[in-house]
From Swiss-Prot:
Its main location: membrane. The chain crosses the membrane at residues 23-43, 58-78, 104-124, 143-163, 190-210, 242-262, 281-301. It is a multi-pass membrane protein. This is Serpentine receptor class beta-5. It comes from the Eukaryota.
Amino acid sequence: MAEINQTKCDLAFQISYHPIYRLAQFWTLSVSLLAVPSLLYFLLKRVLLLPFHGNLKCLLITYFSSIFLYALVLCFDFSYQCLIPFIVTTKCSLIIDQTLYKCGHMTSLFFLTTPMLLPFGFSIERFVAVGMAYKYEKMRTLLGPILCFILVAPNFVVFYFLFRDEQFTDSFISFLVLPNTPAVQFNNYLWFLLYAKIGNFCCNCVLLIFHKRFKNTYLKKKTSLSVRYALEEISNSSKFTLILTFTHLVFFGAYTIGSILVRTLGESFFGNFLNFYVARGVNCAVPTYNLLIAFVGLISLRQLNSRRHAKILTKVLIRVTGQEGARNYDDIIMQQWNTVSNRTR
């Protein structure tokens, strides 16, 4: 037993000081430390102040809050993994304590998968918004909280069945490396989420096409200004959620395919177990997404708002010069005379 433990300690030492592994650890820590204030600013200064309906705002707040919490957890995980090699006195001290690993591992994976589930709520809420555009703005904020609960609760159930028989008796130097027992099932769960996210992205694209035709049909009718405003807000918010869904799909797809590809290629492809474990420990896609999504959100909101203001100016601005200005002036005078004449009858 002592010999086996010493072998694991030697392996932990070799992996921890591997240059590629160390570089990936510091990269993840750096982007996570930057992501925390960026996400907090975006959440408090942008998401909470969005003019969207309360149902969508509830989903967005939950979505970005879960990403923020995941970035916080990664800050703890990778601070530990980056700093411990500088202060340990024995090789075996590099192995994470069983209880600490269990808490850090479960929390990390839970907040990794939770933001992957919430975009399904975006699609459901958007379809309801388009279908009830004429009165959606007056509806209570009820659908959003219900969708948040329905989408997050199954994640607890999945994790319970994945890890209920896991004893966490193996040795680990990374909080994100899966134990062998639930690894296959968790990878299948990731594949399911990836396929579902691809389908969800396609649904978002169909929704935007349908909404465009739906809006054009409504605008041809004599609809009220409030309905026109609601249709425009639904269009902008749907485009924003589509950008979020696509960005998340790209980074999560890279993470899922990369992680499963490493396991599929196996130790023989990487030459030895050391290189294989290093490849398993390099997970930079999702932590990088945590940082970039705040900037993607800021830029996309700024562009959508500028386009909306430009569209409003082109449609609402009344010309006051030239022949068109003269016609507009005559129309306004005639409307005033008609109003006065109707009152005197």
